[in-house]
Amino acid sequence: MTRTYVISGAASGIGAATAARLREEGQRVIGIDLTGTEVEADLSHPAGRAEAAHAATELAGGRIDAVIACAGISAPIAKTTAINYFGVVELLEALLPALRASDAPRAAVVSSMASLQPVSALLVDAALAGDEPRALALGDELASDPSTGFRNYSSSKRALSRWVRRASVSEAWAGSGVPLNAVAPGTDVTAMTRDLLATPEGAAHVDAAVPMPLNHHQPPASIAALLVWLTSPANTHMAGQTIYCDGGADAVLRGDDVWSWADSPEA
């Protein structure tokens, strides 16, 4: 049976690769991006998110089987959080009623391996509290210093992965039968990274931060395949996970013990 997918960031990169794969499988895709997609909208502000959700729901006839949120930027500016966090969360929440109309609703978002890098705890907390003005103000402060501007990106992705973990087990999502998960790529070769990887110096800088011992840099298709499975009817029980599809970067950086936490119970 043909399913209807809504994909943000569908004009390029992981979003385009995912849309192409789904269309090859005979699925219906409603893309959202600034230009060149079925729905053209700017997800950096609340009005654009609301417009995108309304237009996608209308095109889908009120029933959406899966939402895949790929839209994002990596610039060291506050707008990164507006798009990467609020542009994802508000879009998903606005599309939830249409997802509930599906017999097998699914949702997935694109986080990043950068979620493991240094962040601004204040910005992450502001995002999770839904305080966009404060989050953007904190982002502007980070952007004013070249040594901290990058934390706009890592903080936006950390907040997104934490939101997925919280929301996935809530009555709104789990209670509605909607598996919600995230995928965290390593260094994906897209328009976002191509210029940086084009020089030996740039590539060395990236590889030092994101070591990928398995197959090195990855094509968008490697993430698309995972997103397609996560949002298929075959995924009945995976929820709240950020899956690091990153060539082993997470395993290199965090090592073999990711089960230790401050209040872990004693055996």
Place the predicted regions along the sequence by residue.
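C-terminal helical subdomain
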Residues: E90, N152-S154, R158-S161, A182, ...
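Rossmann-fold cofactor-recognition segment
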Residues: I32-R49
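A glycine-rich helix->loop->beta "capping" turn
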Residues: A55-A69, S74-K79, D103-P105, P179
